[in-house]
Regions:
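A short acidic-Thr-Gly-centered motif at the start of a beta-strand
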Residues: 1-5
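Short, surface-exposed beta-edge/turn micro-motifs
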Residues: 7-8, 32
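Short glycine-aspartate micro-motif
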Residues: 9-13
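Conserved phosphate-binding loops in N-terminal lobes of ATP-dependent enzymes
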Residues: 16-102
C-alpha cells in the first residue's frame, strides 16, 4: 500500500434474510437479500428493500429472487447482481472513490 489509498475497503455479510455492508466500522447498508430481475433480459431492476416491495406486486415479467437459501448461495447470477447493486449503494454515499472488491 502506498502513501495514498484511492479505494475504500468494505466488509460484506451475506445473509439469507439481510445483507450488511460495513465501512469504517459503521453499517452503511442493511438491506433485505432480494433482487428484482426482468424475466426477458435478466436485467437488474431493483435490490434490497426496493426489490422486496416489488415481490408479488409487479408485472409478470418481473421476478423477485432471494439468492441465498439456508445460508448458501442458491442462485449465483442473482447473488452477483445483488452484491453489485449493494456495493453501488455504498459508492453513491461516498463521492470520491469506489470500494475495493477483493
Amino acid at each position: 500500500m502506498g502513501l495514498f489509498s484511492f479505494t475504500q475497503e468494505i466488509a460484506i455479510d451475506l445473509g439469507t434474510a439481510n445483507t450488511v455492508i460495513i465501512h469504517n466500522d459503521k453499517i452503511v447498508v442493511d438491506e433485505p437479500s432480494v433482487v428484482a430481475l426482468d424475466k426477458r433480459t435478466d436485467k437488474l431492476l431493483a435490490v434490497g428493500e426496493k426489490a422486496r416491495l416489488m415481490h408479488g406486486k409487479t408485472h409478470e415479467n418481473i421476478r423477485t429472487i432471494r439468492p441465498l437459501r439456508d445460508g448458501v448461495i442458491a442462485d449465483f447470477y442473482a447473488a452477483e447482481q445483488m452484491i453489485r447493486g449493494m456495493v453501488k449503494m455504498v459508492s453513491s454515499k461516498s463521492h470520491w472513490f469506489s470500494p475495493s472488491l477483493r
